[in-house]
Amino acid sequence: MKNFAGVAKHLDTTGEALQQAYATALQANPQLSRGQFLKACVLERNLKPKKPAVTTQAILDGLASGKTVDQTLESLGLTGSEAQAADSAAQSQVTLYAQEA
């Protein structure tokens, strides 16, 4: 719960709501890690204003189909270098936010 609370503050939600959303996503994809889920949420927040197709659900669907985050972002309209940069930035943000709880 601790790392959900830290990330939740930056996503305008609660740790409980984020944890419940993760539990729901985990039912759809039992292989999904907490880190992948949190990164998908941060990616939506970072990218959706300019790339409306980038949603948490679209990223989770890509992961469930066996794609990497980068591959999923590319399929949603980002270039390879944009996808790598966005993935790396989101990972750094999740790591930082999780420590704030």
Where are these regions (language model features)?
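Mature extracellular/secreted ectodomains of secretory-pathway proteins
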Residues: M1-A101
